[in-house]
């Protein structure tokens, strides 16, 4: 089964992200706005209990993280994804690194750029127009997130929470 590990921001930030995602993100209905801590990975049913145990231990060691959204940005020209950029704080970077340790040990596929996606799979022209508009808006937002979530993917492609882990508990 395919799993992923994410932070879900507050409803306030999710509402802001969704106001764009409804129109510009074809994955809008598959998963709420989130910050990916670990890209999707395959784990068998036999192995998932070990993963959950490992994540429980990690959650006790780690503290809640401050999420500071600073601006709208893009991964162009690599791809036409537009996102709300999160400041790569030490605590957020550490949380990401821990998601690739222990039974989950692996090398991340990409450098970690903490973000919340608001638009993807846009044409070049649409990407340019949307990004130009969003860059003029104030994206400043700060909040503390005290939990992360292990998600799994359903047959229809949507993601749902398998387990939630409280940071520092």
UniProtKB/Swiss-Prot annotation:
Keyword Transit peptide among record annotations: no
One MF annotation (Gene Ontology) recorded for this entry: hydrolase activity, acting on ester bonds
Active site, renumbered: 34 (proton donor), 115 (proton acceptor)
EC number, as in UniProt: 3.1.-.-
Keyword Hydrolase belongs to the record: yes
Keyword terms of this UniProt record: Hydrolase
Motif (HXTX 1): 34-37
Motif (HXTX 2): 115-118
SUPFAM superfamilies registered for this protein in UniProt: LigT-like
First-tier enzyme category under EC: hydrolase
InterPro entries found in the cross-reference section: 2H_phosphoesterase_YjcG-like, Cyclic_Pdiesterase, YjcG
Family: Belongs to the 2H phosphoesterase superfamily. YjcG family.
Protein name according to UniProt: Putative phosphoesterase BLi01284/BL02661
Lineage: Bacteria, Bacillati, Bacillota, Bacilli, Bacillales
């Amino acid at each position: 089964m395919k799993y992923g590990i994410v932070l879900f921001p507050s409803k306030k930030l999710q509402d802001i992200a969704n106001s764009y995602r409804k129109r510009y993100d074809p994955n809008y209905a598959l998963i709420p706005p989130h910050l990916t801590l670990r890209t999707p990975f395959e784990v068998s049913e036999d192995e998932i209990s070990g993963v959950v145990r490992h994540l429980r231990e990690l959650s006790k060691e780690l503290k809640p993280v401050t999420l500071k959204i600073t601006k709208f940005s893009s991964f162009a020209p690599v791809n036409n994804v537009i996102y709300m950029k999160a400041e790569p704080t030490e605590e957020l970077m550490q949380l990401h690194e821990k998601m690739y340790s222990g039974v989950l040990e692996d090398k991340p596929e990409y450098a970690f750029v903490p973000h919340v996606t608001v638009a993807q799979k846009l044409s070049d022209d649409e990407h340019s127009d949307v990004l130009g508009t969003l860059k003029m808006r104030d994206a400043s937002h700060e909040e503390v997130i005290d939990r992360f979530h292990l998600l799994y993917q359903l047959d229809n492609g949507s993601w749902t929470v398998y387990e939630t882990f409280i940071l520092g508990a």
